[in-house]
């Protein structure tokens, strides 16, 4: 049986998620066809890292699969600009795939918090995937396997729950870290460390920036 051909990938966005996913795919020798971003400066920087062109107009983009790494509230209006037969993935955690009405649409949601543009994908946290097209779903599995990513099939309803829990826990732990750092609250420090470890073991990323290093010391 012939090996499945790896599709070319377009990246829309130039923020933390776009950088993490783009750099991982590029490191695994997948073809990045372009980067498009409303932020020309950061978009050009990412394109340079991925050794691909920066495309200023979304109308000029072309790739087998386009990964949309932008704010949740901008996903629908962006997807609507593509033809129905264009395969698109988005990384938003709270957007229900049924609300988009795009024929070949998928969710490529990393259950991981990214603190800056240099943070890499962590295989400890799974990629939650969903698609309304069988061929696209198989493409997503192929991408995950090619790039060495853990993945789990997850519908929009369940993904929203995970996303909400991750955000709530993230905020809770950050508050505990603040108390421990600003007010010397030893109990808050201990609880924050416990939650951080437990959630990491469960596959939920918690972002408390560099201060967590001292809490876990």
Regions found by a protein language model. Give the residues of each.
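Phosphate-coordination loops involved in phosphoryl transfer and adenosine-cofactor binding
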Residues: 5-8, 85, 124
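Residues at the starts of beta-strands that form the adenosine-phosphate
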Residues: 8, 31-34, 87, 104, ...
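Internal alpha-helical scaffold of NAD(P)-dependent oxidoreductase catalytic cores
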Residues: 42-49, 119-161, 165-200
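Electropositive phosphate-/nucleotide-binding environments in soluble metabolic enzymes
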Residues: 15, 40, 72, 108, ...
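Interdomain hinge/lid region at the active-site interface
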Residues: 182, 195-217
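Hydrophobic Val/Ile/Leu positions in short beta-strands of Rossmann-like dinucleotide-binding domains
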Residues: 10-11, 68, 129
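Rossmann-like NAD(P)(H) cofactor-binding subdomain of soluble oxidoreductases
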Residues: 40-45, 49-120
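NAD(P)+-binding Rossmann beta1-loop-alpha1 motif at the extreme N-terminus of oxidoreductases
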Residues: 1-56
